[in-house]
């Protein structure tokens, strides 16, 4: 096994810069991977990931403990059938909505960003784990999802994307691809602790695995319409900079709901959208 460990303990600077990144199994067929913990990896060029053998170290890049992957310069689109693994944690339970945007796409086809396809969501209980868990997500047609020690069961009933062309929600179930940059709705699993969202022992950690998205990602949006979008990259996004770089954007909406109400019926729930715009607004003029 060949591995490259990048942690803030060993790097002094919490940024590692790489011209190009190519990760593939060893000549003997053993897994090779990059494990990044609490650091930023900056790749100036392209990333090519060749899939490792199935097993505990199937991924080619593991981002853990707020590690981020950034690409810039003249980087073209990524390629290969290898997997980047990045965690997202939420305490939204089987009655509460998540709005997700995948930082990865299918690890198949030619170069470039791909739709996230059938949802590849693993479950993990250890934020610094390297190994993959034995149970990839399962789907159920029931309204309520569930989780066990090593697997998630996600309800297909709440999987939707919002299309600008029709100005309406479209059911995707567990199979329809969502293009890079677009979002989708999903309810969580089990019942979580609503008293402490940041230290909830029942919170779920979702492991997004696939080819890392990169480059410019266009979201088509017609006048007077809305769309469900999100951060499509395996790194943080400065929303103010995004706002000023996109002159057609007027404002952002964030969903929140009363998570102490455990019901799937719309009439029972309390929720709504909060509006956010940066100070000294200019691009969309809505907030001025």
Feature names for model-found ranges:
Residues 160-176, 274-281, 286-288:
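Short, surface-exposed beta-strand/turn "edge" patches of beta-sheet domains
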Residues 119-149, 268-269, 275-287:
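Charged, glycine/proline-rich intrinsically disordered loops and linkers
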Residues 137-170:
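Intrinsically disordered, low-complexity linker/loop segments enriched in Gly/Pro
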Residues 20-56:
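C-terminal trimerization/auto-chaperone modules of long, extracellular attachment fibers and adhesins
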Residues 1-25:
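Bacterial Sec-dependent N-terminal signal peptides
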Residues 224-288:
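Beta-sheet-dominated scaffold domains
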Residues 42-137, 167-251:
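A short, polar beta-strand/turn micro-motif
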Residues 14-17, 153, 266, 276:
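Generic short N-terminal amphipathic or hydrophobic helices
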